[in-house]
A protein has these predicted regions:
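Sequence-pattern detector for short linear motifs
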Residues: 4-6, 18, 64, 74
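A detector of short terminal or domain-flanking linear segments
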Residues: 1-8, 85
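Short, surface-exposed, polar/charged, turn-prone segments marking secondary-structure boundaries
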Residues: 32-34, 42-43, 65-69, 82-83
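Intrinsically disordered, low-complexity, charge-dense segments enriched in Lys/Arg
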Residues: 78-87
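C-terminal structural segments of small proteins and small subunits
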Residues: 52-79
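Amphipathic, hydrophobic secondary-structure cores in small proteins
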Residues: 6, 10-59
């Protein structure tokens, strides 16, 4: 699915699979942002760090994957804490 948004005053179209849009929306909601605000913030962070963005859609996919991996780690840690509390 494609979505157009304005980054640094330029209308940009991003094409991502629906699952990635859903994950970005989830991340944005957790941060109290709109999806467009989150994407703009991520773009700004990449530009500040690297000075260029070669494949922003790919960067967003990797960001979503990392978010899911971190969430999985947190759930696993909480599960261990719960098991220890029951012992």
């Amino acid at each position: 699915r494609s979505r157009s948004l304005r980054i640094r005053g330029v209308v940009t179209t991003l094409r991502l699979e629906n699952q990635f849009w859903d994950i970005l929306r989830e991340i944005a909601e957790g941060e109290g942002l709109s999806t467009n605000q989150l994407i703009t913030n991520l773009y700004e962070e990449v530009m500040d760090y690297r000075g260029e963005v070669l494949n922003f859609a790919s960067f967003l996919r990797v960001s979503c994957t990392r978010y899911l991996a971190q969430r999985r780690e947190i759930v696993a840690e909480l599960s261990l804490v719960g098991q220890r509390a029951q012992a």
